[in-house]
Amino acid sequence: MTDSPQPIQLIVGLGNPGDRYAGTRHNAGFWLLDELLRRHGGALRPERRYHADLATLHLGPHQCRLMRPQTYMNRSGQAVGPYAQFFRLPPESILVVHDEIDLPPGQVKLKQGGGHGGHNGLRDIIRALGNERGFCRARIGVGHPGHRDGVVPYVLSRPAPDERRAIADAVEELADCVEWLLAGDWGRACQRLHSRS
């Protein structure tokens, strides 16, 4: 992917709400929202009609909305679908940030469109958008447990300290690129993120 048809207007960080899941691999999308708010200010506020917490991010001449669904991961579409429909957001203007077990900790990859790859949060968003798959994704590597039977407990657990540092570094680098994504400069963001070892 080198270009996006338009700048990002909504960044959705996927995860599970509640203290029980805080800091788990599955909540990598939440980690990005926390980092953006730490850097640029603002606060997430509950919007019950969208089953989500929302904030507005101001970054240079650009702004977008940040969304943290308050459904569980498997029902993320209950937040994204109604919001996108109400504001008539083209799928290409939505960036969904999620954990990716097929990438090692410390890697981030951007992608536009595609399937869900077994990720239940993406699966539900695709369903809620009327089988539309054209939204953008930021895939934050969290590593793989080695066998598919171990995936659920793995993503719902907290990473070891060295893995956590690698994931946090990747989140920080993704946060560095957000202004380019808001401007639609996907080529520049991809060049930086995809060159990470």
UniProtKB/Swiss-Prot annotation:
The active site is at H26. The record marks D99 as: Stabilizes the basic form of H active site to accept a proton. It holds the Pfam family Pept_tRNA_hydro. Keywords: Cytoplasm, Hydrolase, RNA-binding, tRNA-binding. It is an enzyme of class 3 (hydrolase). GO terms for molecular function: peptidyl-tRNA hydrolase activity; tRNA binding. Its EC number is 3.1.1.29. It is found in: Cytoplasm. TRNA binds at Y21, Y72, N74, N120. Hydrolyzes ribosome-free peptidyl-tRNAs (with 1 or more amino acids incorporated), which drop off the ribosome during protein synthesis, or as a result of ribosome stalling. Catalyzes the release of premature peptidyl moieties from peptidyl-tRNA molecules trapped in stalled 50S ribosomal subunits, and thus maintains levels of free tRNAs and 50S ribosomes. This is Peptidyl-tRNA hydrolase.
